Structures are given as C-alpha cells and as structure tokens.
Amino acid sequence: MLLTICVFLVALIGITTAVLVYLFTPPSHFPKDIPTIPFYYALLPLVRDNDQVDLYRKYLERPLTESGAVKLFFGGRWNILVRKPAYIAEVLKNEDIYAKSGNQVKIPHGVLAEYTGENIISAHGENWKLYASIFKPGLQQDYDPARVWSNASLLVRLLDETQAAEGAVNVNPILQRYTLANLSEVLLGSTFETLQSPNAPLHAFQLRIKPKIFDPVFLNFPFLDHLKLPTRQEARKVVREFTDELCRTVQSGHSTCHEKGQHKHKNLGCRLLSAFETGILTEKQLQHNMISAFLAGHENPQLLLISALFLLAEDTDTQERLRTELSSLGTREPSYADLQSLPLLTAVIYESLRLYPPISQLINRRTTHPVLLGGKIPIPAGTYVGYNAYSTNRDVEFWGETAEEFNPERWGTTMDEINALFRRANARGSFISFHGGRRACLGQKFAMLEARVTLAKLVLETAWEVDPLWVRRMTPAGPLYARNLRLRFCRIRG
C-alpha cells in the first residue's frame, strides 16, 4: 500500500513538473537568440484589470523592438511573435512557408474552432483559392454608398437621442449596431435591423456569445475544452443557435433576389448562398464563411471608427480642419468620388489604422518546414508565427521619432503623396493594418468606403469631444481600442 502511494506521488510530481516545464519554458528546438516573454504575461488579464497598452509597455515593447522577434506563450502554446518590418514583409510574402493555420487546425476540439471553422481568413491552399473566388468579386466591386449614407443618418439620430438622454454617449455599442447594419444591408443583401432595435436578434446573440467564445481562461488553456464542462457545452449550444440564426436571416433576404446559381456580379451574401446551392460549398463551409464575413465585416470597421472618433475627439483642431475640407465640397452628402479625392480625410483614416490596427496582434501562421527568418532566426517546422501590428505600425525607423503621435499630415498633403506612402509602407511591412501579400484584407475597399462616408456624415453634422468623466483606458486583452469610450456630441445646424 505504502509503495503504491509512493509511486502515485512520484508520478504526480513528475506530471506536474512536466506540465510546468512545458508552460514556463519554450521548446528546446526554438531559437535561442531571441528573448522569451514571461509565461505569465498572457495570464495577467485573468488576475487583474489591466490596460493592455500598459502591459505592452512594461513587458513586450523593449524586447520586441530591440530583437525584432520574441518567444511568446499564447493560445496554449509557445509561438514566435515578429515585429521587425523586414521580418513581417518576409512572412507576408512567403505564404507557402508561413502558411495560414486557423483554429480548426490549432485547436480542433475548441469552442472557438467550432465557431469559426475553416474559412476565407484561416484556410490555405486549394480551399483558400475556392473561397477567394467567391469572396473577391463580392467584396471588391463598386458598392453604391447610398445605403451607408442612409444608415449614417440613423447613426447621427441615435447619437443625438443618447446625448440628450444621458449627457454623453458610450459609442462602442452604437457603432456595433451601425456596422452590423451596413454589413447586412450592403454586403450581405439582407437586414439585421440593428439600427431599428437595440434588441435585434443577431446583435443580442453577439452580446451573449463574445464572453463565451473569448473567455481568456479557455483562450490561454484551450485543452480545457476537452472537458465537457457545462459552461462550455452551453457555449457550443449558443454557437450553433447563432450560426443557424445568421444563415437563416441572410437566406430570408435572398428569397427573391437571385435565381439558383446566378451569383456572378452579386453581393457577397448572394454569392455565398449561390455557391452552396450549386454544390461549390458544403453546408459547413457556407456556415463558417458566413461567420467569417459577419465577424470581419462588422468588427473591423467598428474598431476603426471607434479609434478615429477617439483620436479626433482628443485632437479637435484636426477635427475642425477635416470639417473645413469636407465643407469645401458644398454639400452634406458628397459623391464618393469627391470623398476619395480628399487628402486629409484619407490621411485621418490611415493614421487611425496605423496607431490602432483593428487586429493588433495575430498568430495564425504555421511554418511548413524549417526556415531561417531574416537569414538569422531559425524557426522549426510546425511553429506558429504571428505579428504585433500595434508595435510594427509604430516603427521609429520608418515613421520617425513622432511615430507614437497622431499626425495625419505625415502621410502627405496630396492624394498622390498619400497613396505613394501607403504603397511603400505596405511593401516594407511598416503598415500592416490590412495585412499584406497574397492574403491582404479582401474587405479593404468596402472598409474605406464605410469609413469615409461615416466620418463625412459625422464631421459635417456633429462636433464631439471626450467626456471629462471618461477614464482613459484601453481594453485589457483582445482587440486594442478605447474601453467604453464616452464622447459628448453637439449637433451642427445649417
């Protein structure tokens, strides 16, 4: 009996030691000449309320900036996190070596994998080419901005009503409703009715599902999803209900808008449904790509608008100069061609994206074979590699000593100058808010349309400033943006 207990204790100690070694130290075959970020860095948001910019400054900024890459524990494994623009450019250029590898590969047993599956963002190889053939024409066509202008008018009305009722506006939930409306009505050819009701089903689902999907405990220790815990079973149930509701809502908006299989030159929703009806996509592929379109199609524009409003609220001089530029067009609803010609408007959007990229950190690439990053960092096959866009976009060597400051004029004063700098920064890996290479953001064109029209409407009809009672803090984890941003709006008449 005593011998059995001793054997059990020795085994328990051995297993515990092995787990701790695995968690606290990178694998022995990882590169030795780049810093290791303390294991607990990823866990700090679990134990106390943090501002993730403060955490970045304290733990990540110096080693990442000085070495260009670090070893980072995230998502239940050790990864290589890249920051140096030249390294970023190499990763983005060589997609066959640094292959996309999403949650369906990384944590196939996880709730998050059940939610997103394989999709246009996470797929690699032939499946990605298949999805891209459906998405690209649906996202990159010239959409009529009329619906966005109409929704922007509803947005201004909501801001007015909230300002009058509460004395300030928490803009984040309102902007979520707004970007969901644009996604559904413009890209998906349906309507989620999120601007008409704060309790619209898909908006309510999002409020329920986000805390379950992005629970930091399960994000950092995804092996726990192997356990059939009641809370995770409930999360899986909500995922299935949300997926069914999303597909049903989009399908209902297309009952008379297209003939079976006639998806060419149609909106994205029509193309996805037609691809499913003709057998190009399976039901699972339709569902996962619909989820991907839903998430990227509203969250990224929402985060861009939050950051732009935040920066313009802090810099009211730039806000006023932007108002002057827009007023020079002589109308409250300019043509989109005229909006595209405005240098300051474009520069404000790019500068907002530079300082606060909607996806501030992304680790979703996996090496297909051993590689020497930058000719000097050996990375084994099967290693997950990611990048920190928040850090890379503030690279002093490219952007200068004022890289931390909001300065739209750095982009140039003419559209030719701005476009040239945009192309150069992208090519050099110094501006990666839209990622880059073959896998650059397919929704960039629509995101710019939505941002231009929305900011034009808001700047021409309202002025805003930061609510003095708002505590200036960024989110503790996940997407990096102003937490619970509260602004005071004043309507401009005439």
Description of each model-found segment:
Residues 2-116, 121-130, 145, 149-158, ...:
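N-terminal membrane-proximal hinge/A-helix region immediately C-terminal to the signal-anchor transmembrane segment
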Residues 2-4, 480-494:
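C-terminal helix/juxtamembrane-tail motif
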Residues 34-36, 201-205, 259-267, 310-359, ...:
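Cytochrome P450 I-helix active-site segment
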Residues 96-97, 387-421:
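Conserved cytochrome P450 K-helix/beta-meander segment immediately N-terminal to the heme-binding cysteine loop
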Residues 100-109, 143-305:
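Cytochrome P450 heme-thiolate monooxygenase catalytic core
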Residues 116-119, 291, 296, 336-340, ...:
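Cytochrome P450 heme-thiolate "Cys pocket" and heme-binding signature region
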Residues 300-313, 454:
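Short, small-residue alpha-helix embedded
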Residues 316-318, 440, 444-481:
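Cytochrome P450 heme-binding "Cys pocket" and the immediately downstream C-terminal segment
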